[in-house]
Amino acid sequence: MTDYTPQQIVARGARLEAETAADAIDNHPGLEGATYSILEEDEDRGVWRIDAFPTTDEEDASLMALLGGYDLKVSRDTLADADWLAMALSGLPPVRAGRFFVYGMHDRGRLPASTVNLRIEAGAAFGTGHHGTTVGCLQAYDRLIKARRFNKVLDVGAGTGLLAIAAARTGAKLAVGTDIDKPSVRISKENALVNKANARFVHASGLSNRLVAENAPYDLVFANILARPLISLAQDIKRALVPGGTVILSGLLRTQERMVKAAYLSRGFKVVTRIHRDAWATLVLQRP
């Protein structure tokens, strides 16, 4: 087996084509967990952009074939043998989401005095705060804690640990995060130490972990993952919540909102609010 040379695949086109292609990536059996982003690149011209980062020759070929089937201009570049993700994100501006201010070391000299400042460095884990889904979760959580506090919080698919850390920094007595990716769990633990947050992180597929089970039920569950896992985990999330508990769902495109929502409404959940940011949706629902 030969080593794969990292590539960045870029596809540009109209919003409908880009969103439909992104939805197809999510539902492609050979691209489960594929790393990509979708955003509006040029508002005036209505140009949307997908950036995909395959990790194998097979994933590369599948992405090129899939994206080539849409009315999109597709190109690709070879990435340098470096920590390209950190390089790409190191100059990103800080993000403000409600009371939360998410920043990297390069912005440590200009922190607002009236915000909850969370330092999250660029790296291999998802969730620096810049993605529309992460911002949506923070905005939704900020709105919720204006009315109440959540004592026990679970973050499914924690990535960098940002959401669990945000909960720990705003009054949660227990904040637990899970991730299927072991390096992400390590990064989450490091971020909790940096941010002086009493948050715990464990390696788990979904909610399948002893620590998660022992501390259930939770007042609030974050699940910022992908549409299909959100649907498949609906019953597990319901069991993990107290009656009347809240779940914040994200990682889904607007085009996937209806099917994700249906999985929870069929289990008695009620929609509290929803947030749209770029092509992404965040749903806040309450357990019966």
From Swiss-Prot:
Q: Give the domain of life.
A: Bacteria
Query: Which positions are annotated as binding S-adenosyl-L-methionine?
Result: T134, G157, D179, N224
According to the UniProt record, one GO cellular component term is: cytoplasm
Q: What is its main location?
A: cytoplasm
Q: Where in the cell is it found?
A: Cytoplasm
Query: What reaction gets catalysed by this protein?
Result: L-lysyl-[protein] + 3 S-adenosyl-L-methionine = N(6),N(6),N(6)-trimethyl-L-lysyl-[protein] + 3 S-adenosyl-L-homocysteine + 3 H(+)
MF terms (GO), sorted A to Z: protein-lysine N-methyltransferase activity
Q: What is its EC number?
A: 2.1.1.-
Cytoplasm keyword on record = yes
Write the record's keywords in alphabetical order, separated by commas.
Answer: Cytoplasm, Methyltransferase, S-adenosyl-L-methionine, Transferase
GO BP, sorted A to Z: methylation
Record PANTHER family: ELECTRON TRANSFER FLAVOPROTEIN BETA SUBUNIT LYSINE METHYLTRANSFERASE
Family as reported in the entry's similarity comment: Belongs to the methyltransferase superfamily. PrmA family.
What is the annotated role of this protein in its UniProt record?
Answer: Methylates ribosomal protein L11.
Entry protein name = Ribosomal protein L11 methyltransferase
Species of origin reads Caulobacter vibrioides (strain ATCC 19089 / CIP 103742 / CB 15)
